[in-house]
Amino acid sequence: MKLVRKDLEKDNAGQVTLIPEEPEDMWHTYNLLQVGDSLRASTIRKVQTESSTGSVGSNRIRTTLTLCVEAIDFDSQACQLRVKGTNIQENEYVKMGAYHTIELEPNRQFTLAKKQWDSVVLERIEQACDPAWNADVAAVVMQEGLAHVCLVTPSMTLTRAKVEVNIPRKRKGNCSQHDRALERFYEQVVQAIQRHINFEVVKCVLVASPGFVREQFCDYMFQQAVKTDNKLLLENRSKFLQVHSSSGHKYVLKEALCDPAVTSRLSDTKAAGEVKALDDFYKMLQHEPDRAFYGLKHVEKANEAMAIDTLLISDELFRHQDVATRARYVKLVDSVRENMGTVRIFSSLHVSGEQLGQLTGVAAILRFPVAELSDQEDESSSEED
């Protein structure tokens, strides 16, 4: 994401102009947008025209509109973002108050205006515009004849290539067809790796499969690299890490990311940091339950006692339609940071973020036990009953 301009007043009202450059930038933009915001962007509008002879036709015209946002739709697979709203600025093709849907496009700037920019939204802009936040983990999830080449970014998992090759079964006395097809499959996966993985940024490439597929593939890849003097692969050989998965489908990537060998190798990446933080929470919940809380009311009371060491919170909560509820989560984040606590904002598109979502989306590891907190909550809930 590229920041073109930022104009904010003292009361944090104002606007920012951004250019989405990567598919993931659409996810960041989705998290920036809220109902009631003002969005100005280039769009296509179907306009009816009347010729001098009186015949009516329609043309698709590119124009720039400013909408008051009413609905936001994000397709996580295609990384497409559509924003519906009413036109709030004069335009020769679109009447004031008319409805329109803008589909934000890569490499086309947009301007987003808010009555108040909170700290969480501003932090997301900083992260989205920081080159260091690009995908630092890649993964090849495979089985015989099927492979997915993925990039694991700080916010989501992107499938960059899917390789499918029909592998005939081995026949007694004749394995040549099977072997040729397998070699063709391996070669296509190698090409996908070279095409889609930026080794200057990526710290680790996971190769995950059932059985011995990953070992056989890696042997083939590096033997060919030696034969062809492929310096790109040979110089980055140490970045490849082989792990087990139950299949070659994309959804099993979570198995690979939770592998202990992987979490230790990826200790300095955000995705691995989220996995470790959630694992630490579960361990604390099991062994010292008075130092592990989840649910907004419990976590807020722990924060009042300045007991929070690490706050775990899902980015999904900051997309809440109710302004007061959203402000409550922002206030919690700001307060924990003021009290020298660590805040980890989890992506709901990551495995760990999904798990946190099952725990209400907010949890905390405490500095010290707060046993009476549970009792107070039980008493207040029984009084309400």
From Swiss-Prot:
<comment type="subunit">
    <text>Component of the Pelota-HBS1L complex, also named Dom34-Hbs1 complex, composed of PELO and HBS1L.</text>
</comment>
<dbReference type="InterPro" id="IPR042226">
    <property type="entry name" value="eFR1_2_sf"/>
</dbReference>
<comment type="similarity">
    <text>Belongs to the eukaryotic release factor 1 family. Pelota subfamily.</text>
</comment>
<dbReference type="GO" id="GO:0005737">
    <property type="term" value="C:cytoplasm"/>
</dbReference>
<keyword id="KW-0963">Cytoplasm</keyword>
<dbReference type="GO" id="GO:0070966">
    <property type="term" value="P:nuclear-transcribed mRNA catabolic process, no-go decay"/>
</dbReference>
<dbReference type="InterPro" id="IPR005141">
    <property type="entry name" value="eRF1_2"/>
</dbReference>
<dbReference type="InterPro" id="IPR029064">
    <property type="entry name" value="Ribosomal_eL30-like_sf"/>
</dbReference>
<dbReference type="InterPro" id="IPR005140">
    <property type="entry name" value="eRF1_1_Pelota"/>
</dbReference>
<dbReference type="GO" id="GO:0070481">
    <property type="term" value="P:nuclear-transcribed mRNA catabolic process, non-stop decay"/>
</dbReference>
<dbReference type="GO" id="GO:1990533">
    <property type="term" value="C:Dom34-Hbs1 complex"/>
</dbReference>
<dbReference type="GO" id="GO:0046872">
    <property type="term" value="F:metal ion binding"/>
</dbReference>
<dbReference type="GO" id="GO:0071025">
    <property type="term" value="P:RNA surveillance"/>
</dbReference>
<dbReference type="InterPro" id="IPR005142">
    <property type="entry name" value="eRF1_3"/>
</dbReference>
<keyword id="KW-0131">Cell cycle</keyword>
<dbReference type="InterPro" id="IPR038069">
    <property type="entry name" value="Pelota/DOM34_N"/>
</dbReference>
<dbReference type="Pfam" id="PF03463">
    <property type="entry name" value="eRF1_1"/>
</dbReference>
<keyword id="KW-0810">Translation regulation</keyword>
<dbReference type="GO" id="GO:0043022">
    <property type="term" value="F:ribosome binding"/>
</dbReference>
<dbReference type="GO" id="GO:0070651">
    <property type="term" value="P:nonfunctional rRNA decay"/>
</dbReference>
<dbReference type="GO" id="GO:0006417">
    <property type="term" value="P:regulation of translation"/>
</dbReference>
<dbReference type="GO" id="GO:0072344">
    <property type="term" value="P:rescue of stalled ribosome"/>
</dbReference>
<dbReference type="Pfam" id="PF03465">
    <property type="entry name" value="eRF1_3"/>
</dbReference>
<dbReference type="InterPro" id="IPR004405">
    <property type="entry name" value="Transl-rel_pelota"/>
</dbReference>
<keyword id="KW-0132">Cell division</keyword>
<protein>
    <recommendedName>
        <fullName>Protein pelota homolog</fullName>
    </recommendedName>
</protein>
<dbReference type="Pfam" id="PF03464">
    <property type="entry name" value="eRF1_2"/>
</dbReference>
<comment type="function">
    <text>Component of the Pelota-HBS1L complex, a complex that recognizes stalled ribosomes and triggers the No-Go Decay (NGD) pathway. In the Pelota-HBS1L complex, PELO recognizes ribosomes stalled at the 3' end of an mRNA and engages stalled ribosomes by destabilizing mRNA in the mRNA channel. Following mRNA extraction from stalled ribosomes by the SKI complex, the Pelota-HBS1L complex promotes recruitment of ABCE1, which drives the disassembly of stalled ribosomes, followed by degradation of damaged mRNAs as part of the NGD pathway.</text>
</comment>
<dbReference type="GO" id="GO:0032790">
    <property type="term" value="P:ribosome disassembly"/>
</dbReference>
<keyword id="KW-0479">Metal-binding</keyword>
<dbReference type="GO" id="GO:0051301">
    <property type="term" value="P:cell division"/>
</dbReference>
